[in-house]
Design a protein with these regions (language model features):
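Structural signature of tandem alpha-helical TPR/SEL1-like repeats
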Residues: 17-30, 52-64, 86-98
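TPR/TPR-like (Sel1-like) alpha-helical repeat modules
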Residues: 84-108, 114, 118
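TPR-adjacent "capping" and linker segments in tetratricopeptide-repeat scaffold/adaptor proteins
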Residues: 1-7
Length: 118
């Protein structure tokens, strides 16, 4: 990751920490243009879209993250949360179960499965 792209990525992460999701999207989209296959950028951008309530954009980022890293338990969980926000609970639960199988010690993942199953 070049210094400029890394700076944009760090700026976006800092904006997320400050609760500035919309500003983070701008920084992270610029970083993504420079490194479209960088999983860390895609993850942060997915989170920014999620926090902005932009479910389809978040879904696209988390799906791309899974293309880049299919065994990323958090990516499955985040995609599940995004799908659930769109009313797609059955599809979300598939990703929660995949996340839980990749990280069996996660109480958070198991809790989502239980809640969706009810």
């Amino acid at each position: 990751m070049s210094e400029t792209i890394y700076s944009l990525f760090q700026q976006g992460r800092a904006q997320l920490k400050r609760g500035q999701a919309a500003q983070a999207i701008v920084s992270l989209e610029k970083a993504k243009r420079g490194e479209p296959e960088k999983a860390s950028i895609r993850e942060a951008l997915g989170i920014a879209y999620f926090r902005s309530g932009r479910w389809e954009a978040a879904e696209a980022e988390f799906r791309k993250l899974l293309d880049l890293s299919p065994v990323n338990d958090y990516a499955h969980y985040a995609l599940g949360r995004t799908l659930e926000k769109q009313g797609r609970s059955r599809e979300a639960n598939v990703h929660y179960k995949l996340a839980a199988s990749l990280s069996p010690d996660s109480a958070q993942y198991r809790a989502r499965i239980k809640e969706v199953d009810e």
